[in-house]
């Protein structure tokens, strides 16, 4: 069995995360870690929260990055908060000064992520609490397509605010004002409580905790 020091020279670190989380959050950490530990082989497995958590439980990944996991048996550390909002293309036929109700938002042609996305499930549950069922016109597997299709005027997209800042700053899309605020969530760094992390996983997590604040 490799010693802790040897693991930091020769080990492998497998991380599960969505493409969006990898590009938005993880990339600088991966770059720094690779520079500090060039002998460790980094493997990134792409998947939504449910998939990477399943892989964590099966031992296929060492660390999973998932949205507000509520499953038992996990050690979690919150990396950053996320907020669900609604946007439309800057030329879309709506009143960007109007403050929309939940029902008015639901009445738009909606562009949402597919149902297996945790953010979609959370959004639907929030609207159901108000007695409103969301029936999107378009369902997508890609977050980037939400912005692309909203930009060309196909409808109002439900997006994560933190992931669409560039499109908002460029003016391609605009926020719709609402009289409600959807509760925030977080992207968490997750490991199994009853499994000791490898030296590589411990070093990576320590770096994230130190530098993400």
Which ranges hold each PLM region?
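Alpha-helical linker/hinge and terminal dimerization helices associated
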Residues: 1-6
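Central regulatory/effector-binding core of bacterial HTH transcription factors
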Residues: 10-72, 140
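Short, well-ordered beta-strand segments
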Residues: 12-16, 64, 87, 111, ...
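A late-sequence structural motif
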Residues: 25, 174-213
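Hydrophobic hinge/microswitch elements
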Residues: 48-53, 57-60, 67, 124-176
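Flexible hinge/capping segments at coil-to-helix
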Residues: 74-111, 115
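Short beta-strand->loop
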Residues: 75-85, 170-183
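Secondary-structure junction motif
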Residues: 94-95, 109-130, 197-201, 205-206
């Amino acid at each position: 069995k490799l010693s802790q020091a040897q693991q930091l020279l020769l080990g492998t670190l497998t991380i599960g995360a969505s493409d969006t989380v990898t590009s938005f959050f993880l990339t600088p950490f991966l770059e720094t870690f690779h520079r500090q530990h060039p002998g460790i082989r980094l493997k990134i497995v792409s998947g939504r929260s449910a998939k990477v958590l399943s892989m964590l439980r099966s031992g296929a990944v060492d660390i999973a990055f998932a949205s507000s996991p509520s499953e038992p048996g996990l050690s979690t550390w919150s990396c950053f908060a996320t907020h669900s909002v609604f946007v439309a293309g800057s030329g879309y036929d709506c009143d960007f000064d109007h403050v929309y109700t939940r029902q008015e938002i639901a009445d738009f042609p909606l562009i949402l992520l597919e149902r297996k996305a945790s953010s979609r499930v959370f959004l639907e549950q929030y609207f159901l609490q108000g007695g409103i069922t969301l029936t999107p016109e378009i369902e997508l597997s890609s977050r980037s397509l939400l912005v692309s299709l909203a930009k060309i005027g196909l409808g109002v997209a439900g997006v994560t605010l933190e992931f669409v800042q560039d499109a908002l700053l460029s003016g391609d899309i605009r926020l719709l004002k609402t009289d409600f605020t959807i509760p925030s969530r977080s992207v968490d760094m997750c490991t199994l409580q009853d499994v000791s992390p490898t030296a590589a996983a411990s070093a990576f997590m320590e770096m994230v905790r130190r530098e993400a604040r």
